[in-house]
Amino acid sequence: MGSFLLKKAVGLSNISDLLDKSGIFYNYSTKVLPSFDYDTAGKHIAREDSTWNGKYVIGQPAEVTYSFPKWEGKFNQFGNKNPYEFNELQKEHARKSLDAWSDIANIKFTEVAVGNVDGMKASDVKTDITFGNIYDPNGTFQAYATLPNTYAYGKDLSGQAWFSDYHYAGNTTPELGNYGRLTIIHEIGHTLGLMHPGDYNAGQNVPGYLKSDYAEDSRQYTVMSYWDEYETGAHFQGAYAGAPLLHDISAMQYLYGANTTTRTGDDVYGFNSNTGIDYYTATDSNDKLIFSVWDSGGNDTFDFSGFYQDQLIDLRAGNFSDVGGLQKNVSIAQNVTIENAIGGFGNDIIHGNDADNTLIGGEGDDIIYGHSGNNTIYGGRGQDTLHGGTGSNTFIYKEIADSLVTAADKIMDFKTGIDKIDLSTLIQDTFSSKILNFVDNFTGNAGEATLSYNEVTNASELAINAYGYNYNPDFKIDIVGFVNYETDFIV
């Protein structure tokens, strides 16, 4: 994948030398790469400052037209043989990819119907972006596209995106998660003004990741990279992104401004998604989610409840989550707040952020960190370790299995008079008496609870005999900190 990038007008005979080639040559070094932050990486990917508003006109909204011409003739303008029209599946995924870019930035796309066009006259098409296929056994490129403001030989060659089916048949069968969809999103990125993170194009003795301009040049961070996500410690298990990633969002918003109308309501990402967007939606435990969230408001949720693997779910902007058995495959763009997270069947680690979070562990032995904010934390079944954080936090228990005597939860930082332990659902749904009665010792009656505190270890223990079958508790929570039975419980 790639683009040819013209600094000045050149003859058409030279343009073919600037197109993508299939060979990539690696020349690794021991160079220590600098790290680029979110803004720096975004500006670097957009370093040509080329938009559909003009060269060096950045940060302004744009209206961009596109088309799928019915190509005719033996060549396109770059000397590639047998141009022909996108098929319907390609058109579908091109539209989805365009939507993905406009989702994050102030770009309005309008499709224009275009009829038969000689490939040698592609620059005469009156739309900003044109898509086409090439069947050229002599060509060596997989796909290429031109930036806005690309001129050569007296022609405006801006916004042309060409895809070879001879050297990569997957270009004509794009699906979410495959390389064909990644290729489309990548090439559209070029047509909107994005560069590769380094000054490389396939076929130009590409030096390899270790000679990148900066450490985050990989497909963990940007769809514009040539380098696989594992170069930076991620692992997508053979899947590819189908939408802009973390640094792509930064880059495109630098060029066109942020789309602040995108998803201002209460949105769910993952299982039970209400976004209507394929790359934000999981419906099966085998789905592979790869996305970076841009969201403009509301009370929003990461729902990864349908996955069985151990997961790391991190709601802090700029950080990465390990979701559904993949590593570092989900992130949150800067200036975006996701308030809630739901874990799955594995042993999950969940980090909240500065907002008032609702954090749900689900099944498994989970570790939850509320950080700041006034959080609601529900570990769910399993032996969970719960850190409320600095705010006023509520720890919820709904059933006996949430904290068994043999696998008790541990609340690590309880603050008496500030935090609460909510047993109301547990009492109403489990106790025949519907009442929690604190006692010094169990007497065999249902609904009895004991609460002890060790001043030396600063540890409390809540034990409950829910059913009254004997003198032993069914439910227990270990708590770091003093707990007042009169004020610290919701019953």
Swiss-Prot record:
Compartment(s) where it occurs, according to its Swiss-Prot or TrEMBL record: Secreted
Residues annotated to bind Ca(2+) 1: R263, G265, D295, G297, D300
One GO CC term, this protein: extracellular matrix
The protein's enzyme class: hydrolase
InterPro entries: Hemolysn_Ca-bd, MetalloPept_cat_dom_sf, Pept_M10_metallopeptidase, Pept_M10B, Peptidase_M10B_C, Peptidase_Metallo, RTX_toxin/Mannuronan_C5-epim, Serralysin-like
Sites where the protein binds Ca(2+) 7: G389, G391, D419
UniProt binding sites for Ca(2+) 6: G373, D384, D402, D409
Positions of Hemolysin-type calcium-binding repeats: 342-359, 360-377, 378-395
Classification via Gene3D superfamilies: Collagenase (Catalytic Domain), Serralysin-like metalloprotease, C-terminal
Main localization of the protein described in the UniProt heading: secreted
Needed cofactors: Ca(2+); Zn(2+)
SMART domains assigned: ZnMc
SUPFAM superfamilies hit by this protein: beta-Roll, Metalloproteases ('zincins'), catalytic domain
Annotated EC: 3.4.24.40
Regulation of protein activity: Ca(2+) increases protease activity.
Residues engaged in binding Ca(2+) 5: G362, G364, D366, G388
Binding site for Ca(2+) 2: G298, D300, T337, E339
Keyword Calcium: yes
Positions with a binding annotation for Zn(2+): H186, H190, H196, Y226
UniProtKB keywords: Calcium, Hydrolase, Metal-binding, Metalloprotease, Protease, Repeat, Secreted, Virulence, Zinc, Zymogen
Family, similarity comment: Belongs to the peptidase M10B family.
Miscellaneous field: The Gly-rich repeats may be important in the extracellular secretion of this metalloprotease.
Protein name per Swiss-Prot or TrEMBL: Serralysin
Native source organism of the sequence: Proteus mirabilis
